[in-house]
C-alpha cells in the first residue's frame, strides 16, 4: 500500500511517501522544509500566525505531491510544539478539514514508540536518541524518557547573543545536564547509540565534509564524541550570518544547530557514548507504518476535530 506520512515538528515539516508491505517501508519520495512551527511556543504557549502560515504553505505543496504519487492513506503526526500549544488541537482539526489528512497528536511516550518503530529492531544495549526542536527522546529496550530539551526551545531560552557567549553556552549545558540527571530512568543504559533527526544528521553531514546533503552517506555514519565537540566549537564561534553559509548545513537550520549540538554532546556524555550511529529512519517511517493501518477513507465523510483555529 502506498501511504503518506507527515511529521509536524517544532522545527521542520516533513513528508514521506512510501510503499508499505509486510512491515517494510520503501521510500518513494521524501521532503523536508524548515517551518519553525514552534517559534514562540515555549514562552507564549500558542502556535503563532506566521509559523502556522508557513506550515500551511508547505502542506499545500505536500498534498499536491502525495496525490500525484497516488498515496492511499495520509497520516500527519504532531509532536512537542502542538502538544505545548493551547490552540494545538484546533490547529490539527483545521488541517484535517483543509487537507483531508488524518492527524494524531502524540504524547511523548507515543512519539518515542513511533520513532522506535521507524528505526527498526535494536539490541537490548541500544538507546535511540531523537533530538527535535521542542523535545529530546531517549528510547531504550527497558527505559525511555521524553524531555523538553529541544533545539528551538533551548535556543529561545538561552542563546540570545550572536554568536552565543560562553556564559550562555555554559548555562545551556548546565540546564541540559540537570534535566538528564533528574529525568533519565536508572534502567536506561547503553553500550550503543542510534541518533535520528535533523540535529544529528546535520552534524554527521558536516563531519563527513558534505557540500550537498547525501542521505545514503549520512545513514550509518558513526559520529564520534570528539567530532561533536569539534563541530560545536566551530559553529558556536560563528555569527549567524556566517553559520548560514557553512557548506553542508541547511541555512535555515543554522539558528538552532548550536543548541542541538550542546544537547547531543551532553546526552552522549550522560550515557557514556563515545560515538553514535546516525540513522535516516525515524518517526516518519513509524508514521508510515501507522498510516498503512488506517481504515480506508469514506467518500464524503467530514474529518473529525475542531475547525476554527488561531
Residue ranges and their predicted role:
Residues 1-26:
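N-terminal basic/disordered segments at the start of proteins
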Residues 3, 17-20, 40-71, 81-125, ...:
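Helical "lid/coupling" subdomains associated with nucleotide-phosphate turnover
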Residues 7-12, 129-135, 196-200, 280-282:
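A short acidic Gly-Thr/Ser loop motif
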Residues 24-35, 39, 69:
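N-terminal glycine-rich anion-binding loops that anchor highly charged ligand groups
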Amino acid at each position: 500500500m502506498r501511504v503518506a506520512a507527515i511529521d509536524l515538528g517544532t522545527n521542520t515539516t516533513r513528508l514521506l511517501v512510501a510503499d508499505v508491505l509486510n512491515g517494510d517501508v520503501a521510500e518513494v519520495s521524501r521532503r523536508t522544509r524548515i517551518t519553525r512551527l514552534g517559534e514562540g511556543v515555549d514562552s507564549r504557549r500558542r502556535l503563532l500566525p506566521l509559523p502556522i502560515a508557513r506550515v500551511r504553505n508547505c502542506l499545500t505543496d505536500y498534498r499536491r505531491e502525495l496525490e500525484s504519487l497516488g498515496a492511499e492513506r495520509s497520516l500527519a503526526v504532531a509532536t512537542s510544539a502542538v502538544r505545548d500549544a493551547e490552540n494545538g488541537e484546533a490547529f490539527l482539526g483545521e488541517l484535517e478539514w483543509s487537507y483531508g489528512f488524518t492527524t494524531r497528536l502524540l504524547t511523548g511516550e507515543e512519539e518515542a514508540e513511533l520513532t522506535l518503530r521507524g528505526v527498526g529492531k535494536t539490541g537490548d544495549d541500544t538507546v535511540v536518541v531523537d533530538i527535535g526542536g521542542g523535545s529530546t527522546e531517549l528510547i531504550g529496550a527497558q527505559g525511555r524518557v521524553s524531555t523538553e530539551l529541544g533545539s528551538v526551545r533551548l535556543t529561545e531560552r538561552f542563546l540570545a547573543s550572536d554568536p552565543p557567549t560562553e556564559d550562555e553556552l555554559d548555562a545551556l549545558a548546565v540546564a541540559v545536564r540537570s534535566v538528564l540527571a533528574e529525568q533519565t530512568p536508572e534502567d536506561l543504559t547503553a553500550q550503543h547509540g542510534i541518533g535520528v533527526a535533523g540535529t544529528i544528521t546535520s552534524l554527521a553531514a558536516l563531519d563527513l565534509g558534505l557540500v550537498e546533503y547525501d542521505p545514503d552517506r549520512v545513514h550509518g555514519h558513526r559520529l564520534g564524541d570528539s567530532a561533536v565537540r569539534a563541530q560545536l566549537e566551530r559553529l558556536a564561534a560563528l555569527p549567524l550570518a556566517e553559520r548560514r553559509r557553512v557548506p553542508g548545513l541547511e541555512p535555515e537550520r543554522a539558528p538552532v544547530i548550536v543548541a542541538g549540538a550542546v544537547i547531543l554532546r551532553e546526552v552522549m556524555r550522560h550515557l557514556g557514548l563515545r560515538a553514535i550511529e546516525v540513522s535516516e529512519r525515524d518517526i516518519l517511517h513509524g508514521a508510515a507504518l501507522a498510516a498503512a493501518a488506517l481504515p480506508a477513507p469514506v467518500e464524503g465523510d467530514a474529518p473529525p476535530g475542531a475547525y476554527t483555529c488561531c
